[in-house]
């Protein structure tokens, strides 16, 4: 996104640290897993392309906050400051990523109400800053109990409010994860629901 659209990205990761995110980004550029990158390392003939990839990624304008559990007010405040700073530099904030929604701090009488408020607050951030927000979410364990493992809207963990607040809900499904003998290896299917 950052490279294609020439816009900056703010990532709020409450589960992974910056180093792990960077490892995954670098590994994806080489078509390997971050585990392979750590275990096998970089072969001699890949050192130069590896260093070029690191330089390229570091210049893309990807800002990562890995402080842990943040409130939506803290996310909004950070994004507002970043957007102002980028505007002074003649740059633009083009995307906000929250990984993941259920780890945001919130107060409510039930967990379902907390998550509903977080989803609404993230929607409000997108609207007030005029920047799309991608909020990652966990699925409930119920999907594992079904024969058909393809995700559905009802599988969003803890609340239907996530789908109510979202403009688009997209799921990733890999058939090979559940069916070892599949003829659809290394293909991902995206299930998309557009909500208004």
Describe these PLM feature segments.
Residues 80-81, 89-135:
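Helical hairpin unit composed of two closely spaced alpha helices linked by a short loop
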């Amino acid at each position: 996104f950052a490279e294609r659209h020439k816009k900056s990205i703010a990532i709020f990761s409450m589960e992974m640290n910056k180093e792990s995110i960077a490892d995954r980004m670098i590994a994806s550029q080489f078509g390997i897993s971050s585990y392979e990158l750590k275990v096998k390392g970089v072969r001699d003939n890949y050192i130069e392309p590896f260093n070029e990839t690191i330089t390229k990624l570091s210049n893309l304008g990807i800002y990562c906050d890995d402080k842990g559990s943040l409130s939506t007010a803290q996310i909004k405040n950070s994004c507002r400051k970043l957007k102002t700073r980028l505007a002074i530099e003649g740059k633009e904030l083009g995307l906000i990523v929250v990984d993941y929604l259920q780890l945001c701090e919130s107060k409510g009488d039930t967990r379902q109400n907390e998550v509903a408020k977080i989803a609404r607050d993230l929607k409000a951030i997108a609207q007030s800053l005029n920047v799309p927000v991608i909020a990652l979410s966990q699925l409930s364990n119920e999907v594992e109990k079904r024969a058909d493992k393809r995700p559905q809207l009802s599988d969003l963990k803890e609340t239907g409010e996530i789908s109510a607040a979202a403009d688009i809900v997209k799921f990733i499904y890999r058939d090979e994860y559940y069916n070892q003998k599949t003829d659809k290896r290394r293909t991902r299917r995206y299930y998309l629901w557009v909500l208004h």
